[in-house]
Amino acid sequence: DSSDMSVERWGELARLLFHRRDRYDGFVVLHGTDTMAYSASALSFMLPNFGKPIVLTGSQLPIGVVRTDGKENLLTAIEIAGTWDSSDPQRGPLVREVVIYFGDELMRGNRSHKQDAEGFQALVSPNFPALGEVGVHVRFRRDLLLRPRGEARLLEALDSGVTVVHLIPGMTPEALSHQLCIPGLRAAVLR
């Protein structure tokens, strides 16, 4: 269950990945589906220019269940993390960013969200194309994959004083004001 994920845990995970960056070619993070997209997004901003794959994956059904999606998701995530770029003169990893692999689709970590609690395509990226699709072969969209534009960094200054306000037709100024008058609130994303 990933419902207890927090800003502090994202910091722990980001530090762990950053300090082991030079020891491994890529990383696979097994994660619960409820907060996987939030974690992927946080890691993508905490670890800019990481330069190596960080692939988050998980399953809708527990690994011990006969019809689990977890085995295929894990094996494919490992394959994605271990795929080298044959066209790169430095022969580095093909994927060099935080991604989610789930339900036969490779998604940018900060462009995804969970939309379905029951289906095997539970995580989606509706506003950005898939970075890759998986069938018999893994087909990457090389033109969409990010490349580092500088040194890898660890940015730990996350602020939990942020909220999202969903604007709806007919919302009164008082209702909006009430949502923005939270003690300790430092920023709001208006949708």
Per-range role (PLM):
Residues 16-17, 39-45, 174-179:
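Short, charged beta->alpha transition segments
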Residues 22-26, 49-53, 93-97, 102-103, ...:
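Short coil/turn connectors at secondary-structure junctions
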Residues 24-36, 183-191:
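Short acidic, glycine-rich surface-loop motifs adjacent to enzyme active sites
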Residues 29-52:
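Short Gly/Thr/Asp-enriched flexible loops that form oxyanion-binding sites at enzyme active sites
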Residues 29-31, 55-58, 99-103, 166, ...:
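Short beta-strand segments
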Residues 56-137:
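Internal gly/pro-rich beta-alpha loop/helix module
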Residues 1-19:
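ATP/NTP phosphate-donor binding region
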Residues 108-189:
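Accessory alpha-helical/coil subdomains and C-terminal extensions
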